[in-house]
């Protein structure tokens, strides 16, 4: 399935509202996401000063685990701290210790253009933490048949925005395989001047599959949740087959 590119930008906010409703009625999903947020929390470098900023916060629930995190989105929803656009941030140069993008990278039509802006605002040694879908063999099947956003592992990735592009031109876009291709499979390793790859970690999460995410039905309850954790342990040595999620940490190089 090809990358989504024909929907208006407001589709993102429609999905945020739907996700808030799903969050309120799916306890298994909440538990899984809090575990994911804790994975991000332990990757914050305590030696860095400056704000921790999440871009594309959506529901803003990361504050439940990282309370000091500044939550932002394209849309000025009242539960968020501020409005930001990844292509043109209002943050100062070298002012931020960490940027967190949770399920946001694959919505960037021009990731190289956004990455240059992230590099501008991060202080030297600052971290860009991405949490994304993993395009393992099993995950591709699950996301293809049970999620509305395409994986798009064969579509071209347009790294830089065309001449004349402005942040106001940002539109709805989705290609879930983008981070996998660029960081796990290595297609983007030669496109990272000024960055150091600190970590690329595929994560098995059968309980995430079983939860149905935000858009699908939840399968089972607490018992199934425990069973899925057991499957995660068994499948962990085979990430290219079974990984559901991908954690990427980039560091801005120190001059």
Residue ranges and their predicted role:
Residues 128-164:
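Conserved class I S-adenosyl-L-methionine
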Residues 112-127:
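A short glycine-rich, Lys/Arg-flanked "PGG" loop and its adjoining helix->strand segment in the class I
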Residues 65-66, 82, 139-144, 209-215:
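Short aromatic-enriched loop/helix-cap "lid" or pocket-rim segments at secondary-structure transitions
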Residues 97-110:
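A short SAM/SAH-binding and catalytic strip from SAM-dependent methyltransferases
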Residues 1-87:
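Conserved N-terminal segment of class I S-adenosyl-L-methionine
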Residues 167-186:
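Acceptor-substrate binding/catalytic loop of class I
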Residues 190, 194-255:
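A C-terminal cap/extension of S-adenosyl-L-methionine-dependent methyltransferases
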Residues 87-99:
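A short acidic, Gly/Pro-enriched loop at the edge of an enzyme's catalytic core
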